[in-house]
Amino acid sequence: MKAMLTKYHCIKQHDIKDCGPACLATISKQHGLKTPISKIREVAGTDKQGTNAYGLIQAAEKLGFTAKGVKTTKKEAIFEEFPLPAIAHVVVDGTLLHYMVIHKITKKEITVADPAKGIVKYTPEEFFQIWTGVLILLVPAPTFKKGDDTKGLFSRFFHLLIPQKKLLLHIFFASIIYKQGWFH
């Protein structure tokens, strides 16, 4: 396994249960849609155990993808043609269920975006040791729209203040009165 930098996108997971939503955010970004992991987590039904494949498929469809899960018992099926990037279900360290994005497959190496590590290249043998045989295939549907669903820090903060505008006005005027020394 070799870590490397390439032209492929990789959105890092926020915590151990975010690998599925991070993979979906990576594929969305690859297709021109920036969307926050928190939004995907909510739509996918991510809980303390993470996200199941059905939740990822549902979230992908809400983002404008056509998605389906497939399972194979033949590891060599990875060399057959299918749309990339795709999400692969893997088992890390023999126990941890995890998702990765497959960006490129050749007979010599498989390039993945691991939301825990970044862009990584595996030999097919290394990949077969961790892959469960499950893939989630995604293609943009005709309804897919490129764009940016993320909000900057200021807009998120401002959005929280809007419901408190009456309180903020009172604080503002009280501070002016206090500063002017109108009340001792």
Q: Predicted segment positions?
A:
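Membrane-integrated ABC transporters
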Residues: 1-184
